[in-house]
Regions:
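Residue-level signal for alpha-helical context at structural boundaries
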Residues: 61, 74, 81, 131-132
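A generic secondary-structure signal for well-formed alpha-helical elements
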Residues: 51-54, 63-71, 117-121
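Hydrophobic alpha-helical bundle architecture
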Residues: 56-60, 67, 95-97, 127
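Alpha-helical support elements that line or immediately flank enzyme active sites
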Residues: 40-63
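Extended glycan-interaction surfaces of carbohydrate-active proteins
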Residues: 1-37, 68-93, 118
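Residue-level detector of alpha-helical recognition elements and their boundaries
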Residues: 58, 71, 78, 128-129, ...
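Carbohydrate-active enzyme catalytic cores, enriched for enzymes
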Residues: 1-3, 29-32, 40, 50, ...
Length: 195
């Protein structure tokens, strides 16, 4: 939806089986066909890991508080915070968000954006660069401090791809793939990734 992915559809109208407690909530709210904010971050990450940059960014924008300022009278939460959930299309208050400051959404969306959309994926030995972005992003830059080393990362997308790696250059040296071993990093680093 324009406010994020619905948890399930259609909503429960009655107990479908023992333990189907979603029916205790009004249709379109919370677990009964609402739009849970925290899971949106994992959806962003999942689409990015599949290389679907357009979809990952769309999911981010649908649930981003800052992107909903033009519908503040519907959303009814502060423009700088996530709610726990937004009422789904089965509700007569579709788009209204609830329970601000009681959610882990900011952290899951941050992981979805940093590791997914921007593609900065650290591990024990180094850093993998694997952005999944909208095709229209022809160039963007990232300033990152990674294990005490400064990285200036330029991402070039001349062929309007959503993901992939054509080349990765670290301090003028072309690397074998999209992975930067930590032992190659200097105090200050210039990184150019071409999709």
């Amino acid at each position: 939806t324009e406010y994020g992915a619905i948890l399930m559809d259609p909503p429960y109208h009655a107990h479908a089986f023992d333990g189907a407690l979603a029916v205790i909530y009004n249709q379109g709210t919370k677990e009964n066909s609402g739009i849970f904010s925290q899971s949106q971050g994992w959806l962003i990450l999942a689409e990015a890991l599949r290389g679907h940059g357009e979809r990952a960014f769309t999911y981010f924008m649908e649930n981003s508080p800052a992107a909903q300022n033009d519908c503040a009278e519907i959303r009814r939460l502060e423009p700088y915070c996530y709610g726990q959930f937004t009422e789904g299309k089965a509700s007569k208050h579709f788009g209204r968000s609830h329970v601000h400051w009681l959610t882990g959404t900011a952290s899951t969306v941050m992981v979805g954006c940093v590791e997914g959309i921007l593609g900065l994926r650290p591990d024990l030995e180094g850093l993998r660069l694997s952005p999944s972005v909208p095709k229209s992003w022809k160039h963007f830059e990232i300033e990152k401090v990674f294990r005490g080393k400064q990285l200036h990362i330029s991402v070039e997308n001349p062929d309007e791809k959503e993901s992939g790696c054509c080349s990765l250059v670290l301090n003028g040296q072309k690397l074998a793939d999209n992975y930067i071993p930590e032992n190659l990093l200097q105090d200050k680093n210039e990184v150019v990734l071409t999709l």
